[in-house]
Every structure is written in structure tokens, then in C-alpha cells.
């Protein structure tokens, strides 16, 4: 799954990645560290905090539109 991330360059590829991620959870649940949505979301937040101060950080955080990310996550709740 992680190897697919670098090739995502369009909305369609992102949607396909989300669908693949959902399928991976269904098919390989035992490989997932986080088994609940709350654990999953908490660990995303934790990873962002840790990685943003890591020497390995290669993300340009100021270029990310966090409002859109928040909207995507919220719409998954209510749509």
C-alpha cells in the first residue's frame, strides 16, 4: 500500500487508493495496528506530530490544505 502513495497525482488515483485501503482493511485486518476508527484517527494525529519534527521529514507542511483534509475526514462521517 505504501508504495502506491508516491504515484498518486489525481483525484481519481486518490479515490482508488482510498478504495484499496478499505479493501486492505477488510482482507488483512490482522495486519492493521489500529482496529477502531478512533485509534486510526488518533494515530494519524500522532504521526503528524512526530513526523513533522523528525529529521526524516520530507513533507512541506505549509503547502498542505488542512481545511480540505478536515472536510474529507468529516464527510466520511456524515455522507
Can you say where each PLM-predicted feature lies in the sequence?
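Intrinsically disordered, low-complexity Ser/Thr/Pro-rich tracts
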Residues: 4-7, 52, 79
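Amphipathic alpha-helices that form helix-helix packing interfaces
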Residues: 14, 21, 40, 44-47, ...
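Amphipathic alpha-helical interaction surfaces
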Residues: 20, 24-27, 46-54, 72-75
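Amphipathic protein-protein interaction modules
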Residues: 30-63
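Short, compact, well-ordered microdomains
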Residues: 54-79
Amino acid at each position: 500500500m505504501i508504495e502506491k502513495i508516491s504515484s498518486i497525482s489525481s483525484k481519481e488515483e486518490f479515490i482508488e487508493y482510498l478504495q484499496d485501503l478499505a479493501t486492505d482493511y477488510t482482507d488483512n485486518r490482522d495486519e492493521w495496528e489500529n482496529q477502531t476508527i478512533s485509534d486510526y484517527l488518533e494515530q494519524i494525529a500522532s504521526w503528524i506530530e512526530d513526523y513533522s519534527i523528525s529529521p526524516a521529514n520530507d513533507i512541506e507542511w505549509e503547502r498542505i490544505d488542512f481545511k480540505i483534509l478536515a472536510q474529507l475526514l468529516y464527510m466520511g462521517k456524515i455522507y
